[in-house]
Amino acid sequence: MKHLRIIAIDIGNSATNLGLFTGDRLERYDFLPSSPEYSEKVCQLIESWQPDFHHIVIGSVVPALGDLLETRIKERHNTTPMMVEDFKTELIPLRVDRPETVGVDRIVNCYAALRLFGAPAIVISLGTANTFEAIDAEGEYIGGAIAPGIKISLET
C-alpha cells in the first residue's frame, strides 16, 4: 500500500517549520525565519526534497505570509496548497463563544494531542507566545489562554 506524501508547513510568528511526511513518518524537516524574504527558500526546499508529493498543507498564524506562500507554491509547483484556516473548525469541536478567534496553531496542537494521547487533555505550546489549551473528556476544545513567550517575558 502506498502512503500519502504530504509537505506540512507551519508558519509561526518567528519561525516557519517544514516537514515531509510519508504516512505518519517524518522524513525530512527544516525551518526558516518567518519572513516574506524566505518564501523563495521554502519553494526551493520543497523542490530539493522530491517532487512526488500528494499534498501541501499550510497552517499560518501570519495571514499575509500564509497567503504569499500559497501564491508562490501555486506558481512554482502547479498545485494549490490546503490552507488549515479553511477547514480548522472540522478538526476538533470548538465549544467557545468565538471559535473564529482560536488560531490554527492552537487547533492543530489540540488535534495532534487528541490523536496521540486522547481526551481529556491540557495542551501547552511554548514559543513566541505560550499557549495553554483545555480539551474535555468528549474531545472538545473548551478554552485556552495565551501568555508572552519566554524571550518576550525576559525583555520586559
What are these regions (language model features)?
Residues 1-3, 91-121:
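Conserved phosphate-binding catalytic cores of ATP/NTP-utilizing and phosphoryl-transfer enzymes
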Residues 115-118, 142-156:
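Glycine-rich phosphate-binding loop plus the immediately following alpha-helix
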